[in-house]
């Protein structure tokens, strides 16, 4: 479960990197600042805020995986984008929904550069993220592109 939550948070941070046009170091620093501020507020109030269902508990996140993967995606973004773009029919990266692109980059990185994650797991997790965060067509689209990337290897 820890890897699943870590992957989800990594995708969210990749999305944030694209929207804010920040690098992974800036995103990690922003995350650390937010966590510190939340801890300060909780200690002042003497209570722990209720966690909403959509929020990811950092105790359930593998921060080493998160940082390693964010860095890897950033450092290999050109290669990842070339592989992704190769399998886009009548589309360009600029036309993709940012959430779909974040999922594709994350899972393509796992397929192409990570020996820790079997290709079928990366594909299935990408589809699950697409079901949760993408539109109705995202899961099939993500599945098709990632499957082609995995098969080329």
Curated annotation (Swiss-Prot):
Source domain of life is Bacteria
The record's listing under NCBIfam families reads:
nusB
Which lineage?
Bacteria, Bacillati, Bacillota, Clostridia, Eubacteriales
Q: Does the keyword Transcription apply?
A: yes
- Keyword RNA-binding listed: yes
Q: Which GO terms describe its biological process?
A: DNA-templated transcription termination; transcription antitermination
| Free-text function comment from the UniProt entry | Involved in transcription antitermination. Required for transcription of ribosomal RNA (rRNA) genes. Binds specifically to the boxA antiterminator sequence of the ribosomal RNA (rrn) operons.
Recorded GO cellular component terms are:
cytosol
Instruction: State the similarity comment.
Output: Belongs to the NusB family.
Question: What are the UniProt keywords, alphabetically?
Answer: RNA-binding, Transcription, Transcription antitermination, Transcription regulation
Report the protein name in the record.
Answer: Transcription antitermination protein NusB
Q: One MF term from GO for this chain?
A: RNA binding
